């Protein structure tokens, strides 16, 4: 399989690779997550962090390509059982509206969604598989496994967010929707509809934090301006 993608354009390597990371992180904190999906998601995230930049820089590195394929499969196994979250809800609607690559949209959104999900929810999900809110703890635990600085849960979350931003930058992924070429006036005219539609997306139901439409709109605005 690695032979099939050695000539893949760098931008597609970056976009699809960040989609894999998004699959892993969303499955990891899903309200349907289990011990099985956690193990798959953790390993998938680790493989992406260690191998995606090498695939981007040196597409002919078959070992790195193989590990990214493994990561993609494991992340797929994780989210096919635990489902996804609002990162994909938003990317689905933005992709339909602006025809930008799905993985690129996920990559731009991911730091903002991780930060959002790490905060105490306005209300809990209807059928949580845990007794208290643990998304922030899980993000921090993953950050520790990735070798990031984690003296507190909050620091672990922030370290993970910064690692995602750093990887995006190394892959030449835009920092914001504005940088990705979405025209401001058009975006602001559509943002309320996009927020409503993202709220109704099937992925929203598995997000660890049940979002208000107003909160989804704020994520969109933050992601547009790169705040």
Region spans (language model):
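Carboxylate- and glycine-rich phosphate/diphosphate-binding segment that chelates Mg2+/Mn2+
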Residues: 1-82
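Predominant activation on well-ordered alpha-helical scaffold segments within soluble catalytic domains
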Residues: 18-26, 42-53, 69-73, 87, ...
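Flexible, glycine/charged-enriched surface loops at secondary-structure junctions
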Residues: 32-40, 55-67, 82-87, 153-157, ...
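Short acidic alpha-helix initiation/capping motifs at coil-to-helix transition points
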Residues: 43, 85, 165-173, 193-199
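Glycine-rich phosphate/pyrophosphate-binding beta-alpha loops
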Residues: 73-106, 201-206
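Gly/Pro-rich interdomain helix-loop hinge
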Residues: 100, 104-186
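Short, amphipathic C-terminal "tail helix"
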Residues: 186-227
